[in-house]
């Protein structure tokens, strides 16, 4: 017993200690497990007294990087949990300054473990977390936490002082994700300075030596898979307001809209290691509704010293309204004075559906032609998420006017993370003509956003182009020919950025030296500059458009007339009959080198004679005593030395002759005061009338010249095949009037029947008339007055589906004019149609106008026909497509610029004002003379057609934005003595309705009066009813204030009473051109 007692006592003493130890182990089992798991790590780092555990609410894992060590990547909103365990000593956990008020920290004495937990982690929480031993600060472990939302760069102080730069400067473009060095680039004053030594925890470090160039602006750029972001930093010459904190905004919702409860928080965060929030300071707000705060609509919540290094204040807005939009300023004040402020623009959408632009490539881009490609991109988000449509467009100014074209259109499918999207336009094959304003329109539900870019593609070598705007030309063997005396309108166009002037020169045939041509006006586009010239063609010449060493050449040849074959008969007949002698003349232009002409009929060559004039070659073919076998196709073939052929053909038809024969025995019943011979023949016979054996008259129909027409009448018809006679006795004495009563009854019955037919078949007749009208349009060859015809076929037809008709832009008595767009070419046109589609009379007026316009050759000062839609004319649809002139009519143009008019005739003229003013809103004396010269040129062209305008006035003249005029409504005006037109009409037109080119000259003189009175009314002191009397008394309009004396002398010449004493338009043009040159030289 004595031997066991000591042992039992020892066990009794040890048992309580053993039980306490077991309980301790059970309570801290999990820490032992963790400790056991980390023992290998500790063993790898035997000198470390602490080690770091971490875990997250998701399955993210710890990763390692050679440069930054251990790290983890999280997404904003997740929860971060960290554990720091020590073998001995008191733990110390350090973390980024931003986290002081949101960290849940707990320390457990067993195993010396410190816990850190952060819920709803934010992008701004990115930073390094470290575990340190208080006894041995050198012993530590750390991990870097990246928290990403949408931006790749963390907010940071953006202004640094030169004082900050001592041995080195850190540009703190820290990232929220681990990035590779080559993905981040550093630019100093726009130049790339670093791309390799980037640390995502700190940014770029620049030594004092690297700062030798002393840049003032740094930019960090992130580029990866069409995703680009950047952040800027400024080096200030002045001392910063404060260099230990940053000020930034945080909003609660990226898509604020009407009705939403919105919050906006301003944070002041101290970033220096020893920086503390000051005790005497506050964050103040300025905003659209900050002063009113009605009904608790807007509440400001202030939090001072939230944590040691942070101040925060928030604005809460209930039921957001449009009036809440605007600038919100957060002002950091210390001791009552503002030290720094930051601004936030709040955009409140009226609808829930929104398109928010997040990022875009630079809005102004310059590139070199041929350098590759330019990418335009925009990053944006739509709310709520859904499909949207986008349209890429380009607008630019061409030398002919504004252009708007669709580059790309469709449903987007480019989606990024966080419900964001990106659109990219790759502009390849760079050249100057790819320049302009590019627009991206994003359409989503009932809202849209548009983004703009300016793209300028510069070229070291401008392109040049020579354009001759003269449609009355033709080609033979590739040579361009124009008629002698043609007024050539030549455009010398240079394509480049920046714009440069092109020079036009010409060289006459057999001359070696080029001569410079004086330019008339300049028109600029986005990447084109057009310099226009006018040349009267008198002989063959070579034209050269030149910019430096870049040259465009064009050889212009003169011809007396367009190649053609003419008929000439020995006798004056409209057809060719057996026995006639026919002369065929083939007219072709004179060509350099040796050329031969051959006539071919039924594959056989025919003998002919030739003649050469200064500008033409003529070949004559005579067919004597023609027979019907001579009918057929005759071809004139021109062959050059290269064995190339140019041919013209015509069809000759020889009619057989027929002796005169009686169509109807005896005379037809008298029709009014005429009798018909009723004898026909081929060729048409000559007729001789006899009364009672005495010659009485000629012609097929005989007119009565006596009241008593009784007698025996004979008609003798004779042609080359023979003759025939028809006779009849006419008695008029004692005639009964019963026949007239019978005829009256018969006529009344016919009228009743016709009335019934008209009332029952009105629709049929209208359709028939419209069909006949259409046939007359297609088949008519008498387009022009005086029988002159330019075109035999109507070849301007467009399909109605190719035209989009828009808003009305004008109207007249017979028609209405609307703006339209040709869908294929996006060309803007003016569309004219009848005011009443069901009116045959109105449609006929439009048809006649179309016929005339289609036959008038184009001229830069005469409104040109673009085309027509006639296929549905049978159903009352007829549209004339004309040039669209964007400046309106000349009278309104002049009246609207009276306040800005520059009178260059007086001494107070400012010599610094340029003579050439392309601005459409400006107006000067030189402009007025130039406009008058253009009208004279246009009217001279119409007079040479010939075509009488009949209603010339400034209302009938259109003007473009480049101050080029077009004469309109020519030849189809309502030539009636109307009060609205009498002030412009010549006296013979008012009194006798006599219209001619001379009456147009009178109206041109009135136009000059309108121009130099800036849209004034002619005869301002005379009532309309007395105009004719006023003119006959010798009264004329007085000289306008702004009119040069030489041009008033021209007006008086135009207003001479005898029409033959008035000048031709060619003289008017010449006199005005001289005045224009004198005016230019004088200034």
Curated annotation (Swiss-Prot):
Segments forming domain Ig-like C2-type: 563-647, 656-731
Pfam family, one: Ig_3
Broad class of where this protein is predominantly found: membrane
Topology versus the membrane: Single-pass type I membrane protein
InterPro entries: Ig-like_dom, Ig-like_dom_sf, Ig-like_fold, Ig_sub, Ig_sub2, Kinase-like_dom_sf, Prot_kinase_dom, Protein_kinase_ATP_BS
Compartments, as annotated in UniProt: Cell membrane
Topology feature Cytoplasmic, residues: 757-1083
GO process terms (BP): cell surface receptor protein tyrosine kinase signaling pathway; nematode male tail tip morphogenesis
Any GO MF annotation of the entry: ATP binding
Signal peptide: none
SUPFAM superfamilies linked: Immunoglobulin, Protein kinase-like (PK-like)
Positions with a binding annotation for ATP: 809-817, 832
Keyword set, alphabetical order: ATP-binding, Cell membrane, Disulfide bond, Glycoprotein, Immunoglobulin domain, Membrane, Nucleotide-binding, Receptor, Repeat, Transmembrane, Transmembrane helix
PANTHER family per the UniProt record, alphabetical: PROTEIN VER-1-RELATED, TYROSINE-PROTEIN KINASE RECEPTOR
Protein name stated in the entry: Protein ver-1
Organism of origin: Caenorhabditis elegans
Gene: ver-1
């Amino acid at each position: 017993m004595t031997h066991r007692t000591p042992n039992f006592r020892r066990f009794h003493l040890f048992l309580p200690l053993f039980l306490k130890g077991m309980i301790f182990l059970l309570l801290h089992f999990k820490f032992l497990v963790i400790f056991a798991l980390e023992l290998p790590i500790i063993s790898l780092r035997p000198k470390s007294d602490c080690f770091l555990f971490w875990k997250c609410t998701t399955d993210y894992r710890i990763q390692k990087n050679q440069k930054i060590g251990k790290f983890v990547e999280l997404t904003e909103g997740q929860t971060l949990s960290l554990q720091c365990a020590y073998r001995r000593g008191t733990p110390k956990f350090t973390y980024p300054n931003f986290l002081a008020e949101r960290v849940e920290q707990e320390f457990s004495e067993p195993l010396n473990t410190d816990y850190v937990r952060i819920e709803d982690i934010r992008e701004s929480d990115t930073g390094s977390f470290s575990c340190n031993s208080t006894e041995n600060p050198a012993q530590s472990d750390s991990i870097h936490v990246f928290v990403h939302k949408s931006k790749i760069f963390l907010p940071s102080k953006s202004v640094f002082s030169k004082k900050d730069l001592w041995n080195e400067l850190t540009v703190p473009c820290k990232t929220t994700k681990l990035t590779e060095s080559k993905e981040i680039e550093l630019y100093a004053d726009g130049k790339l300075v670093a791309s390799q030594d980037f640390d995502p925890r700190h940014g770029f470090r620049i030594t004092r030596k690297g700062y030798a160039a002393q840049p003032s602006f740094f930019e960090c750029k992130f580029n990866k898979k069409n995703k680009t972001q950047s952040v800027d930093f400024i080096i200030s010459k002045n001392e910063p307001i404060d260099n230990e904190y940053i000020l930034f905004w945080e909003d609660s919702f990226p898509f604020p809209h009407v009705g939403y409860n919105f919050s906006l928080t301003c944070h002041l965060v101290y970033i220096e290691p020893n920086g503390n929030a000051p005790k005497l300071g506050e964050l103040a707000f300025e905003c659209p509704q900050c002063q009113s705060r009605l009904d608790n609509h807007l509440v400001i919540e202030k939090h001072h010293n939230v944590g040691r290094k942070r101040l925060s204040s928030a604005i809460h807005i209930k039921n957001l309204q449009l009036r809440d939009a605007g600038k919100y300023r957060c002002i950091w004040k210390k001791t009552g004075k503002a030290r720094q402020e930051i601004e936030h623009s709040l955009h409140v959408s009226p609808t829930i559906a929104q398109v928010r632009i997040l990022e875009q490539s630079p809005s102004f881009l310059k590139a070199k032609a041929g350098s590759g490609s330019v990418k335009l991109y925009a990053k944006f988000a739509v709310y709520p998420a859904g499909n949207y449509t986008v349209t890429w467009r380009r607008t630019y100014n061409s030398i002919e006017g504004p252009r708007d074209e669709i580059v790309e259109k469709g449903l987007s499918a480019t989606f990024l993370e966080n419900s964001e999207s990106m659109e990219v336009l790759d502009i390849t094959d760079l050249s100057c003509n790819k320049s302009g304003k590019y627009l991206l329109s994003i359409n989503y539900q009932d809202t849209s956003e548009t983004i703009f870019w300016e793209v300028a593609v510069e070229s070291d070598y401008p392109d040049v182009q020579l354009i001759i705007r003269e449609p009355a030309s033709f080609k033979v063997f590739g040579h361009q020919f124009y008629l002698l005396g043609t007024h050539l309108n030549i455009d010398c166009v240079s394509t480049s950025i920046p714009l440069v002037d092109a020079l036009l020169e010409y060289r006459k045939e057999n001359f070696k030296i080029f001569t410079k041509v004086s330019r008339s006006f300049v028109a600029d586009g986005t990447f084109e500059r057009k310099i226009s010239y006018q040349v009267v063609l008198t002989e063959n010449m070579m034209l050269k458009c030149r910019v430096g060493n870049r040259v465009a050449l064009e050889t212009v040849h003169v011809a007396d007339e367009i190649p053609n074959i003419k008929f000439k008969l020995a006798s004056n007949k409209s057809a060719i009959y057996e026995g006639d002698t026919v002369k065929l003349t083939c007219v072709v232009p004179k060509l350099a080198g040796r050329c031969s002409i051959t006539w071919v009929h039924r594959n056989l060559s025919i003998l002919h004679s030739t003649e050469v004039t200064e500008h033409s070659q003529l070949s004559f073919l005579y067919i004597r005593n023609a027979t019907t076998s001579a009918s057929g196709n005759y071809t004139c073939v021109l062959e050059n030395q290269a064995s190339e052929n140019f041919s013209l053909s015509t069809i000759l038809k020889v009619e057989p002759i027929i002796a005169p024969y009686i169509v109807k025995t005896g005379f037809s019943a008298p029709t009014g005061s005429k009798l018909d011979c009723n004898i026909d023949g081929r060729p048409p016979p000559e007729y001789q009338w006899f009364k009672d054996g005495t010659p009485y008259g000629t012609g097929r129909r005989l007119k009565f010249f006596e009241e008593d027409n009784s007698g025996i009448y004979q008609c003798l018809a004779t042609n080359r095949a023979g003759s025939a006679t028809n006779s009849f006795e006419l008695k008029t004495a004692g005639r009964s009037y019963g026949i007239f009563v019978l005829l009256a009854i018969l006529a009344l019955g016919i009228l009743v029947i016709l009335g019934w037919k008209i009332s029952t078949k009105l629709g049929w007749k209208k359709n028939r008339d419209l069909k006949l009208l259409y046939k007359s349009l297609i088949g008519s060859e008498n387009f022009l007055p005086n029988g002159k015809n330019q075109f035999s076929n109507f070849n301007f037809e467009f399909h109605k589906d190719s035209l989009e008709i828009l808003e009305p832009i004008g109207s007249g008595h017979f028609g209405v004019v609307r703006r339209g767009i040709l869908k294929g070419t996006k060309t803007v046109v003016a569309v004219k149609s009848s005011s009443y589609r069901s009116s045959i009379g109105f449609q006929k007026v439009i048809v006649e106008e179309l016929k005339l316009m289609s036959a008038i050759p184009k001229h830069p000062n005469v409104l040109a026909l673009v085309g027509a839609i006639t296929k549905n004319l049978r159903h009352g649809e007829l549209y004339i497509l004309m040039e669209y002139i964007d400046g309106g009519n000349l009278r309104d143009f002049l009246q609207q610029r009276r306040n800005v008019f520059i009178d260059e005739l007086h001494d107070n003229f400012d010599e610094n004002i340029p003579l050439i003013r392309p601005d459409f809103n400006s107006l000067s004396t030189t402009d007025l003379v130039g406009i008058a010269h253009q009208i004279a040129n246009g009217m001279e062209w119409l007079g040479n057609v010939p075509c009488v305008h009949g209603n010339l006035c400034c209302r009938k003249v259109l003007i473009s934005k480049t101050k080029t005029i077009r004469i309109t409504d020519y030849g189809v005006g309502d030539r009636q003595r109307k009060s609205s037109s009498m002030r412009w009409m010549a006296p013979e037109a008012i009194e006798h309705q006599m219209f001619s080119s001379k009456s147009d000259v009178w109206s041109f003189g009135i136009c000059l009066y309108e121009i130099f009175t800036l849209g004034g009314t002619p005869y301002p002191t005379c009532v309309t009813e007395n105009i004719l009397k006023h003119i006959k008394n010798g009264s004329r309009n007085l000289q306008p204030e702004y009119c040069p004396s030489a041009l008033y002398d021209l007006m008086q010449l135009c207003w001479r009473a005898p029409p033959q004493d008035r000048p031709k338009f060619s003289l008017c043009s010449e006199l005005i051109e001289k005045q224009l040159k004198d005016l230019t030289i004088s200034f």
